[in-house]
Curated annotation (Swiss-Prot):
Function: Specifically catalyzes the removal of N-terminal proline residues from peptides.
Catalytic residues identified in the record: 110, 266, 294
Domain AB hydrolase-1: 35-298
UniProt gene name: pip
Major location (coarse): cytoplasm
EC number(s) given by UniProt: 3.4.11.5
Protein name: Proline iminopeptidase
Family statement: Belongs to the peptidase S33 family.
């Protein structure tokens, strides 16, 4: 079974100004003359971490990571202004041009898979391959499954902690109820809602519960960006024209090679998502990891993702 590549440090990093207010942190690792790949983090709002550098062979790949608008080290932190899917798609292109890259592989999981599909369908000529994990397409049923009723029946203990932040009278629409608190003028209200929202996802992302991973979701800096930006996208339907836009436009990536990795026991983004995408994009190979959940860092997901990236060099 494959494991992550050894730790690697960036050979370049900086801040890219993408509009009058947003500045994005980016970094480059691996071989400056290698095959380019851009890593798209989840959330939206999750930001990059050092382990995300390690799915690609650093001797063969030029590995580009960046924090999307409002996330991680990008500024302004947790900001929702001019923060849409299509702003992020444009940002990826601005980063590609700024780094002098002609075409690149696009790698992303969860929300990163959403953004990767949106980017590749908009810029297929610039996309050499797609390596996707934990498919998420922001359809209404997907949001209701995780944030209203569905996953709640598998994790009732974590669910009760999640909904404790919302009075019973508002629980018929939890995404909207959290939105009111995450956009409150009161800092304490925003933080309490952000931590409840973030801990719910942290508690459900792994097949075997990882207490350190869960605790990391309570960090105020992480939680505020993660919850505020996620919720902002969800109340706006991902800023898509129709909820199944990524499936509707799958023909635009029909000839792009790809690998879809999805955990059989992914509670955050059910396997149905990957199945639907694979039927719409048969050129991609689908790898269902039989003993994994949602997290990219579960052993079987790591193995499948590293095998996928190795196959393209």
């Amino acid at each position: 079974m494959r494991t992550l590549y050894p730790e690697v440090t960036p050979f370049d990093h900086g801040m890219l100004c993408v509009d009058d207010s947003h500045r994005l942190y980016y970094e480059q690792c691996g071989n400056p003359h290698g095959k380019p790949v851009v890593i798209l983090h989840g959330g939206p709002g999750g930001g990059c971490n050092d382990k995300m550098r390690r799915f690609h062979d650093p001797d063969k790949y030029r590995i580009v990571l960046f924090d999307q608008r409002g996330a991680g080290r990008s500024m302004p932190h947790a900001n929702l202004t001019n923060n849409t899917t299509w702003d992020l798609v444009a940002d990826i292109e601005k980063l590609r041009v700024a780094l002098g890259i002609t075409r690149w592989q696009v790698f992303g999981g969860s929300w990163g898979s959403t953004l990767a599909l949106a980017y590749a369908q908009t810029h297929p000529e610039q996309t050499t391959e797609l390596v996707l994990r934990g498919i998420f397409m922001l359809r209404r049923w997907e949001l209701e499954w995780f944030y209203q009723e569905g996953a709640s029946r598998l994790f009732p203990d974590a669910w009760d902690r999640y909904i404790a932040a919302i009075p019973p009278v508002e629980r018929h629409d939890l995404i909207s109820a959290f939105h009111r608190r995450l956009t409150s003028d009161d800092e304490a209200t925003r933080l309490a809602a952000a931590q409840a929202w973030s801990l719910w996802e942290g508690a459900t992302s792994c097949l075997y519960m990882d207490q350190d991973f869960i605790a990391s979701h309570e960090n105020p800096h992480f939680a505020l960006a993660f919850a505020r930006i996620e919720n902002h996208y969800f109340v706006n339907g991902g800023f898509f024209e129709v909820e199944d836009q990524l499936l509707r436009d799958a023909q635009r990536i029909a000839n792009i090679p790809g690998v879809i990795v999805h955990g059989r026991y992914d509670v955050v983004c059910p396997l149905q998502n990957a199945w639907d995408l694979h039927k719409a994009w048969p050129k991609a190979s689908l790898k269902i990891t039989p003993g994994a959940g949602h997290s990219a860092f579960e052993p079987q997901n790591i193995d499948a993702l590293v095998c996928a990236t190795d196959s393209f060099v």
